[in-house]
Amino acid sequence: MAKVSLIKKNESRKKKSQSLHNKRVALKSKIYDKNISLEERFSLVMLLAQLPRNSSPTRIRNRCELTGRPRGVTRKFGISRNKLRELIGRGVVPGVVKSSW
């Protein structure tokens, strides 16, 4: 089980990223617009840099929903490989069967 503080920190990063997503996308679209002068684009880059660091989506860590484990998390289920194997073995996950050949 991961530390509760790390899980909470990641949750706050998710919330902050969602709340400032529209502002960040608008600034980036203006920055990449070639019709705007270089000075204006540079000032927009500075505005983007002033946004909170934790509002960037790259700061969010994919964690297991059950244990909070940061590594080995499947995108499809949002669960770590260990817990996924355990749940599949018990037959809890619908549509997934253990392969044998």
Curated annotation (Swiss-Prot):
This is Small ribosomal subunit protein uS14. PANTHER family: 30S RIBOSOMAL PROTEIN S14 (PTHR19836), SMALL RIBOSOMAL SUBUNIT PROTEIN US14M (PTHR19836:SF19). Keywords: Ribonucleoprotein, Ribosomal protein, RNA-binding, rRNA-binding. Residues 1-21 are annotated as: Disordered. Belongs to the universal ribosomal protein uS14 family. Residues 11-21 have a biased composition (Basic residues). Binds 16S rRNA, required for the assembly of 30S particles and may also be responsible for determining the conformation of the 16S rRNA at the A site. One of its GO terms (biological process) is translation. Part of the 30S ribosomal subunit. Contacts proteins S3 and S10. InterPro entries: Ribosomal_uS14, Ribosomal_uS14_bac/plastid, Ribosomal_uS14_CS. GO terms for molecular function: rRNA binding; structural constituent of ribosome. GO terms for cellular component: cytoplasm; small ribosomal subunit. The keyword Cell inner membrane does not apply.
